[in-house]
Amino acid sequence: MAKESNIVHRYFKKKFDRATILVKVNPFIFKGMEITLPDEGEPEIRELTFDETIWEDLKMDGFEESSPLEFNLYYSGLAK
């Protein structure tokens, strides 16, 4: 299995009325993170564990593939 640092994660995004959700998924071990960006207030970061159906779930929920740069800017606190 590939080392954690060698994994190319997949990133997704969905805009809601009052927030945006960014998701990062490790496609090998199905773990990742979710950043909730409310229009007002502080971002919330959660670590998540997924299963093999995550791709269908994200598609059904209206998430679209997005940029790793955007996710990592919010995760590092450089974007607000």
Task: Set out the residue ranges of the language-model regions.
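Acidic, low-complexity, intrinsically disordered interaction modules
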Residues: 28-58
